[in-house]
């Protein structure tokens, strides 16, 4: 377990504040002090417990809004009902991680090189503590060859029972479930650990899970697509760099892309299917391994995590039919053809956002810097000009702008990761950082079992009749 203990501490003895701290509004949270992650949380948790206690005591009866019938039968969209500390989604500005926008995170979070993409480790620290970790040569992903034999014992045997024809997400979830045997929370709960200390084994499990996922995910990839030969971890690399390496991609630009990809896909507040599922299952005191496996099954749905693969497949269908040098007029015709056939144009629109997704924007900037002449990137750029006006003309779409999925597949494809069915696994590895961080705070704050009230259509009809009389 030494490997996972060192991961949870990130081997950080951090001292110097980031040089751009004062230029970013949200850095009122202050830079991290010279404490390891566990110690910082131990200091922060009592303060936040008192804050929550005061909030409940003084404002517990304050109404946050009105629940309508549309909300009840429309997937609870727009209904405020979850406490989620790690991020907040603004319809116009996009996601903020502990108050920091994506561009701000790119400025202040440490990178593998000066000016490079943020390290996922830095974002993990930010989500857990609300503080920006200082740039340090010691802030890296400490890998140890011991993870490979441990993985082979726990995961490779169950995964060998999966058919190669099983979708990658099925195999990935199987691997996560196989890791559950090492849950510290389950062991501690069975021994009667007091509720006030639930967060500590949850912390161990969550950080252990996050650390192991690149190995599990890369094994799934190489088992399905590369004949099953695993690649040893490289203990000189960070989390994102090692994930790229384990998959078989050692290009520096691909490693930078993986750092960016994991960071921007890590969290998107608590109402989306995967995040809500993880929170819901964990509210029953299921350990982080079980809770995250449940979240992955939600992520595997076509309306959630499968969208990124569908975008790339749709873009390739455009190229197959019209060629790489398609004009904007031809593209308009193809978009209308898609819509008139009863299908949607994947990668556009969002349940909450009402402007272009900042996660799309930062990926576009990455493409302009590293692959400006890629044919599929040029096609994505044309789609940005063509699709929103058409969707606006239809009048049925609240947000006609591109989301994160409109771009990610093209970037991965450029560097050789062309297997679209695997993309959701990458999403899953990324999302573990947000879900795992919030699960720790769920237990630290003592959040209760989730149990909303359900109704029947008959009861709704009866209520509405009484309200109208």
UniProtKB/Swiss-Prot annotation:
Which reactions appear under catalytic activity for this entry?
oxaloacetate + acetyl-CoA + H2O = citrate + CoA + H(+)
Spell out the Gene3D superfamilies in the cross-references. Answer: Citrate Synthase, domain 1 (1.10.580.10), Cytochrome P450-Terp, domain 2 (1.10.230.10)
| Cellular component aspect of the GO annotation | mitochondrial matrix
Q: Which GO terms describe its biological process?
A: carbohydrate metabolic process; citrate metabolic process; tricarboxylic acid cycle
Pathway-wise, it operates in: Carbohydrate metabolism; tricarboxylic acid cycle; isocitrate from oxaloacetate: step 1/2
Q: Which InterPro entries match?
A: Citrate_synth-like_lrg_a-sub, Citrate_synth-like_sm_a-sub, Citrate_synthase, Citrate_synthase_AS, Citrate_synthase_euk, Citrate_synthase_sf
Q: Which GO terms describe its molecular function?
A: citrate (Si)-synthase activity
PROSITE patterns given for it? Answer: CITRATE_SYNTHASE
Give the active-site positions: 304, 350, 405
Pfam families under this entry?
Answer: Citrate_synt (PF00285)
Tell me the keywords, alphabetical order: Mitochondrion, Transferase, Transit peptide, Tricarboxylic acid cycle
Any idea of its EC number? Answer: 2.3.3.16
Asked if Repressor is a keyword of the record, the answer is: no
The compartments listed are: Mitochondrion matrix
Broad class of the protein's primary localization: mitochondrion
Question: Where exactly is the transit peptide annotated in this entry?
Answer: 1-28
Identify which top EC class this enzyme belongs to.
transferase
Q: What else is on record for this protein? A: Citrate synthase is found in nearly all cells capable of oxidative metabolism.
Tell me the subunit arrangement. Homodimer.
Of which family is this protein a member?
Answer: Belongs to the citrate synthase family.
Official protein name in the record: Citrate synthase, mitochondrial
């Amino acid at each position: 377990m030494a490997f996972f203990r060192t991961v949870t501490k990130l081997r950080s003895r951090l001292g110097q504040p980031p040089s751009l701290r004062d230029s970013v509004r949200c850095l009122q949270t202050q830079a991290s002090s010279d404490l390891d992650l566990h110690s910082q949380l131990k200091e922060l948790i009592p303060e936040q417990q008192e804050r929550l206690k005061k909030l409940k005591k003084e404002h517990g009866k304050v109404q946050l809004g009105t629940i309508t019938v549309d909300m009840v039968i429309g997937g609870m969209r727009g209904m405020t009902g979850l406490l989620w500390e790690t991020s907040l989604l603004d319809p116009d500005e996009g996601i903020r991680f502990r108050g920091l926008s994506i561009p701000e995170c790119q400025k202040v979070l440490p990178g593998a090189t000066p000016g490079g993409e943020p390290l996922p480790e830095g974002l993990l620290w930010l989500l857990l503590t609300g503080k920006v970790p200082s740039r340090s040569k010691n802030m890296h992903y400490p890998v140890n060859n011991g993870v490979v034999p441990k993985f082979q014992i726990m995961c490779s045997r169950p995964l060998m029972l999966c058919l190669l024809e099983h979708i990658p997400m099925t195999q990935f979830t199987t691997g996560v479930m196989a890791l559950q045997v090492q849950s510290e929370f389950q062991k501690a709960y069975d021994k009667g650990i007091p509720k006030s200390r639930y967060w500590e084994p949850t912390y161990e499990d969550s950080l252990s899970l996050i650390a192991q996922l690149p190995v599990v995910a890369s094994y799934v990839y190489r088992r399905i697509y590369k004949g099953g030969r695993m690649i040893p971890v490289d203990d000189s690399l960070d989390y994102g760099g090692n994930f790229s390496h384990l998959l078989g991609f050692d290009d520096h630009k691909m490693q930078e892309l993986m750092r960016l990809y994991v960071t921007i896909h890590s969290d998107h507040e608590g109402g989306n299917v995967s995040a809500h599922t993880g929170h819901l299952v964990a509210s029953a005191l299921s350990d982080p391994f079980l809770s995250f496996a449940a979240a992955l099954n939600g992520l595997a749905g076509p309306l959630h995590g499968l969208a990124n693969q569908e975008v790339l497949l749709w873009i390739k269908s455009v190229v197959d039919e019209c060629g790489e040098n398609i004009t904007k007029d031809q593209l308009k015709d193809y978009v209308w053809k898609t819509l008139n056939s009863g299908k949607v144009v994947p990668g556009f629109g969002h349940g909450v956002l009402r402007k272009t997704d900042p996660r799309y924007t930062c990926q576009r900037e990455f493409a302009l810097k590293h692959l400006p002449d890629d044919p599929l990137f040029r096609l994505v750029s044309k789609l940005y000009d063509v699709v929103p006006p058409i969707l606006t003309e239809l009048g049925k779409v609240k947000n006609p702008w591109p989301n994160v999925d409109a771009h990610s597949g093209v970037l991965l494809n450029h560097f050789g990761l062309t297997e679209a069915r695997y993309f959701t696994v990458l999403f899953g590895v990324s999302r573990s950082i947000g879900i795992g961080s919030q699960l720790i705070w769920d237990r630290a704050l003592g959040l209760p079992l989730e149990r909303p009230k359900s109704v029947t259509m008959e009861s709704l009809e009866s209520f509405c009749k009484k309200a109208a009389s």
